[in-house]
Amino acid sequence: MGKDTIADIITSIRNADMNRKGTIQIGSTNITENIVQILLREGFIDNVRKHRERNKYFLVLTLRHRRNRKGPHRTILNLRRISRPGLRIYSNYQQIPRILGGMGIVILSTSRGIMTDREARLEGIGGEILCYIW
């Protein structure tokens, strides 16, 4: 775990998804809770619960896997960190990129909190582009 908590979340979810793990545990901060709520609302994860262990809070995520005859396969195809501590990427609401023609989502940090690209376009606000999920 480094200083970039958003990159840590993305890496943990990507690694658990590739290894077909059912649950993962990540550190709980305000930013991570907001991003996880967006992932839950958009249907990329099944369940979230807050776990306390020796005065530290963790989020336990249950990933969504579809079953087929050969076993479970992954649902989340790609996660990509865009804005990072060394290079911040900002966009106004007209220039927020559309991922796969609107099939994917862009998570933004705006003045009104962390939200998806659709919500930011509806409210007419831009912000820092945190990550793409498609």
Curated annotation (Swiss-Prot):
Superkingdom of the source species: Eukaryota
Stored Pfam families: Ribosomal_S8
GO BP, one annotated term: translation
Record bears the keyword rRNA-binding: yes
Molecular function in Gene Ontology: rRNA binding; structural constituent of ribosome
GO cellular component: chloroplast; ribonucleoprotein complex; ribosome
SUPFAM superfamilies recorded: Ribosomal protein S8
Claim: Chloroplast is one of the keywords in the record: yes
Keyword annotations of the record: Chloroplast, Plastid, Ribonucleoprotein, Ribosomal protein, RNA-binding, rRNA-binding
Cellular compartments annotated: Plastid, Chloroplast
Subunit annotation: Part of the 30S ribosomal subunit.
PANTHER family to which the protein is assigned, alphabetical: 40S RIBOSOMAL PROTEIN S15A (PTHR11758)
Role: One of the primary rRNA binding proteins, it binds directly to 16S rRNA central domain where it helps coordinate assembly of the platform of the 30S subunit.
Sequence similarity: Belongs to the universal ribosomal protein uS8 family.
The protein's name: Small ribosomal subunit protein uS8c
Organism lineage string: Eukaryota, Viridiplantae, Streptophyta, Embryophyta, Tracheophyta
Gene: rps8
